[in-house]
Amino acid sequence: MFAVIRTGGKQYRVAKDDVLEVERNGGEAGDKIDLEVLMLGGEGGTLKVGAPLVDGAKVKAEIVEHTRGPKITIFKKRRRQNYRRKNGHRQDLMLVKILDIAG
């Protein structure tokens, strides 16, 4: 059985025991969370599509750890204007393990 979930403005296709790297949205390591289910698929080709969510379907997950993404450099420049700006960014992420898909 698989599900398509939505978290952090992105969609992920997950199955039981998958480990995902998603954007951090609160909670501590070891906490259990429920994720929104957009689509649910099972054995035999059965498919439930939500509008926008599947009623009664839940994906239970556990936060494994908090991490940070790679450093991204932002550089802005306007030619002949002596205008240069350099910035950096690292996204806060968390590893999530899918425990159960019910629905």
UniProtKB/Swiss-Prot annotation:
Pfam families noted in UniProt: Ribosomal_L21p
Keyword vocabulary terms for this entry: Ribonucleoprotein, Ribosomal protein, RNA-binding, rRNA-binding
BP GO terms, sorted: translation
InterPro entries the record matches: bL21-like, bL21-like_sf, Ribosomal_bL21
MF annotations from Gene Ontology: rRNA binding; structural constituent of ribosome
SUPFAM superfamilies the record matches: L21p-like (SSF141091)
Cellular component annotations (GO), alphabetically ordered: cytoplasm; ribonucleoprotein complex; ribosome
NCBIfam families: L21
Function, as annotated: This protein binds to 23S rRNA in the presence of protein L20.
Family to which this protein belongs: Belongs to the bacterial ribosomal protein bL21 family.
HAMAP family the UniProt entry points to: Ribosomal_bL21 (MF_01363)
PANTHER family the record matches: 50S RIBOSOMAL PROTEIN L21, LARGE RIBOSOMAL SUBUNIT PROTEIN BL21M
Subunit structure and binding partners: Part of the 50S ribosomal subunit. Contacts protein L20.
Protein name: Large ribosomal subunit protein bL21
Organism of origin: Parvibaculum lavamentivorans (strain DS-1 / DSM 13023 / NCIMB 13966)
Record lineage: Bacteria, Pseudomonadati, Pseudomonadota, Alphaproteobacteria, Hyphomicrobiales
